[in-house]
Amino acid sequence: MNGHKGHLTRRAWLIRVIKGLAGLGAFMIFPRLNPVQATETIPAPERRESIGETFANESMVFTAGFFIFPHAGDAEISLVPLYEKGRYQATISGKTRGIIGFLTRHREDTHISELVENEKKDRFICIRLIRDTKIGNDHTIKIFEMDYQNRKMTVRRIKGKRESVHVKPIPPGVIYDDPLTAFYNFRFGTYGPVRYGKSYKIDTIPGKKVKHIFLHVASKKETEEKKKNLSIAKKVNYLVYLRIAPEIIKSKKGEIEGWFTPSLIPLYGVAKDVIFFGDVKGKLVHLERG
């Protein structure tokens, strides 16, 4: 069976299974977290002297779902200080749950970014990125190590007993921000003040066809129009469109829409056209700060 035919067969099979289970939706039992209610006040991070001190020990938990499966998985984003001052580890980890976990062989994804602050302490720079994927008994690790002094990036891919290593040049003056690094830099104002209608083009680790992360903050008019039917309408202030490498979120175009509070806490988002599942919706259910 060739790859294309296999892809279609798996998709058709998954659609049939989901349709067959539609009548059981009311009886599905998934583990739940206490949600951050729309009526609650979402505290802003206390802006401190440096970007690291501002977000250190912040943890966000999201629940994600689609169609009749409102809780198909969980994801957590966290930032912790490391052994050396000015060095941090940012992590995003996600796991499918329940029947979707069974159908996806309990897929687990973990992205770890080792970050250092720049001299002004107003920007994170990723010096090592680890992408770890487990699907059933399959385990793949991809490691990117950035050496900005010598302008080179070492890429290691480990799958089972097989390992490959490639060294690629980093163009002069370029700093690669992976999506996790960009998440904190954007919220801190590293790319400039967040304004309605503003767009950002951010250099990122080159993917198959992507060399940049694109961010766009919707206009005030568009934001007000689109949030009319949101239960969290009074808590969100910005609608942000994000485009990253499609292979990272396994979608057609790598497009994400996110709703942020005035202090840039993400409350709700949609990953568009995820393969097999369509639009996957996520909401913040737990927030902690150190």
List PLM regions with ranges.
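Acidic, serine/threonine-rich low-complexity disordered tracts
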Residues: T39-Y148, G192-G290
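Residue-level marker of intrinsically disordered, low-complexity segments enriched
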Residues: N34, R156, V165, L242, ...
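A charged, solvent-exposed segment within the mature domains of Sec-exported extracytoplasmic proteins
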Residues: T140-S199
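N-terminal secretory signal peptides
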Residues: M1-P35
